[in-house]
Amino acid sequence: MSYRLFRIGFFQKEQGMCQSCLEAISDTGRLHFCHCGSPETLAAMRKIEADISRRQMLGGMAAVVGMFAGFGLAPTEVRAQASGIPVLLTNLRLFDGTTLTLRDGVEILIEGGRISALPAPGQGPAEAERIDCGGRTVIPGLIDTHWHTTLASVSQIVAMTQDIGFLHLMAGKEAGATLQRGFTTVRDVGGPAFGLQAAVDRGVVAGPRIFPAGAIISQTSGHGDFRFQNSLPMMPADPADYASAAGMSALADGVPEVLRRTREQLMKGASQIKITAGGGVASQYDPLESLQFTEAEMRAAVDAASDWGTYVCAHVYTSAGIQRCIKAGVKSIEHGQLADEDTVRMMADNGTWWSIQPFLADEDANKYTDPKAVAAQKMVAEGTMRAFEWADKHRVNWAFGTDILYGGGESQGRQLTKLARFMSPLAALHRATGAAGELLTLSGGRAPYDGRLGVIAEGALADLLVIDGDAEAGLDWLADTDNLRLIMKGGRMFKNSL
């Protein structure tokens, strides 16, 4: 047979049936495709790629790597685990992501990209390659549950005016920096992250695991409507606005449109769906207190996501907005700093997850001149302190996220250190490891990675960090990446300065 690869899941074939799901592959001209995404299909795709003109591929790769090496896009993996040889981390203290204590008298055995055992010292296999951690602490790779891959490293004006190709290249560069900050997984909650996810997973670009939501689904004049007033009204024959065409947002009004936009993101490979259910601090058109999407519209998104085994998360701050989300079946509240205590109790009673960002009145706060935005920012900062208190008081499931936009990605680790102002350092780390990993399991079968994340336990994916710093005493070491002595993702070392 003759094959020519176009992209993941799409290839030409003389006659087609997916040999994994055993379903006929529909024909559009010469293009046959299957979306089963099974390991067998992906393995076949890798073999197909290997059969493509190796000389052309190697020549092209050399040119591309040479062109972008200085830009940060060349893979920065230090060394993969040698085939079939286990790796044993020794002489360490362990924070496993769930237990709020450090453990001594344990080693970490890694095989096939996973943690295969936690043997006592001296009990690991003799053939294992040993890495002496020098008495340092080993923690799970960090997880940011509220990240925007495409928007984290560029200014707002660049995001809204530059060619989307430039934004993707900048996102690739930022992905490498994100991994070097110790964040081995991010939940992307809005933006065209599918291409970067594929590049990272295939080893083209170094970066974290990405759980993509795809385009933010927003009502007209909602928090994800990035049009200008001079583009209104839009007529049916008008081309899509820039943000929609680029995959930043998808506008939907009414149940049928919400269903369609949700299903489009699922078709692209979304692991969860993101909607906007309220306004923002500095939004130009949607007030902070505004309610967005009716309950019926929200439920349409929830139904479509549930039919695919996944869930909806929602940008929302106010009690009224959060309550509407919960009634509609939304599983994860993003922000929520203006919730009253009754609403927090409602979240706890319904098992709703809460992704809380440390929006505080400090050096990382956005600088506003508009009095309304300044006042709204003050309310959110005060609400952030209550959110941490009430979330723990009422035993809400919650996890750490940053929501860094338009530059400032270097503050990602520093943002996590702020949680130690409100709880013990290990409790704060738990929210960016074990708890965050549990939130990611809501994606069910749409999760792009098979295995537990955020924990150091038998069978978990081998994403971990070796740190210089006392994790029981504080988290200030997170602000300096030099304190991350080893960064491992899937058993592969992307940094080793031990």
Predicted regions and their residues:
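C-terminal cap of metal-dependent C-N hydrolases
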Residues: 92, 445-447, 452-498
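N-terminal twin-arginine translocation
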Residues: 51-56, 65-85
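His/Asp/Glu-enriched, well-ordered alpha-helical/loop segment
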Residues: 307, 380-470
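Active-site core of metal-dependent hydrolases
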Residues: 18-21, 34, 220, 275-386, ...
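Divalent metal-dependent hydrolysis catalytic cores, especially in the metallo-beta-lactamase
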Residues: 170-196, 207-216, 270-283, 311, ...
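Metal-associated gating/positioning segment near the N- to mid-region
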Residues: 136-202, 220-229, 296, 328
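N-terminal secretory signal peptides
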Residues: 1-53, 67, 71
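Histidine-rich, glycine-flanked metal-binding segment
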Residues: 73, 77-79, 85-87, 94, ...
